[in-house]
Amino acid sequence: MGLLARLTGAAFATTATPALGWMWYTRATTFVPFPTSSPDFSSATARKFNPGNNPPVCNDMAVRTVPLDQLKTTDQETLTRQFCQGIWSGPGFEIQRRYLARKYRQLGGRWDHLWEKADLKSSRYNVGTKIADHFEVVERTDEKVCLINAGNKSSGLIEIRLLYDAATLH
């Protein structure tokens, strides 16, 4: 009975801990459907990497509202860059980054990839930036950074966009 209780406790802990961590980490985030009628699906970048105009398999949007007084700057490009720096150097990418580094970093041709947390935190995320042998920046504007899976260019686009709205009127 002691073994069964320990196994049950271990199963609960390994299931509940990540679930509770995800809930805490995304507590101020709302996930909403991303309409397939969005002009993003017909952009030059989307047409380049999806020439067959295939429908998206997974398209959602994570929305987080941050009060203006919590921002250190109001410059759109700086906010977008800091947003990317926070995503890729933060805890959400930590385990995957370590796994990818252990598996692929020693292979040839990967000297220019961002592997270290400090590099991810200081990068400007310009077009051509490669992240841990897995992502590559293919489009960059002041308000967004588009990435693809660096090893499979047809796997879909990831868009990180920051919309700066000084006043939302209802």
Residue ranges and their predicted role:
Residues 151-170:
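Beta-strand/loop substructures that line and gate deep hydrophobic ligand-binding cavities in soluble
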